Amino acid sequence: MQIEASPPSGNSSTIEKYDLSKKAYVLVLHHYEFKNKEHNRSGSMQDMVQIKKVLTDFRTDTLKIHSNLSLKSVQRAMDEVSTKDFSKNSCLIVFIMSHGDTKDTIMAYDGEMYSFQTDVVEKCTMNATLKGKPKIFVIQACRGDAEIQTDATRKIISDKKDIVTFQKFHKHQQSPQHYKNDLYSVI
């Protein structure tokens, strides 16, 4: 299967073609239990069951689920993604479920926040075997009251053109659990 993606008007006259004949690699960062029990996300396991159910209908090679990782463990997992060989995969799909906050940060098990842009997107886009392949992000987390910002002292050199991010809620909005009907209609 091939999918054609037209660039936004004014950017380029070429059309990107993605070869989706290979299976997708799916990574899930599922944070539902936290060191501070007040942050536990009851009901989140039902969302995970639905994600697994939906993905059985798709051509997925691997469903790699990381549950309740600390900040350092999330960073290690994403470092592995940055160097993993995805040449046998057509695309990368990343699900993130947790609490979120300002500047598109996401809460890890230990209550520490990691950056969606720096700790997740950057690690995926720097992987050479994902170049020219879709990288799809589905996030279930509140967004806080700020937009994504990058650290001006850090050089971001990876290619960001093959990314699709689904975030059901805009900044300043709460993100209720059991969003599956809306999410799955998008997928």
What are these regions (language model features)?
Residues 1-95, 130, 150, 170:
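Boundary/activation segment at the start of structured domains
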Residues 31-35, 69-71, 98-102, 111-114, ...:
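Conserved beta-strand elements of beta-rich interaction domains across eukaryotes
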Residues 38-43, 67, 78-79, 106-110, ...:
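Short coil/turn segments at secondary-structure boundaries
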Residues 46, 50, 73-77, 93, ...:
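Acidic, Ser/Thr-rich intrinsically disordered and amphipathic helical segments
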Residues 98-131, 148:
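A short, glycine/acidic-enriched catalytic loop
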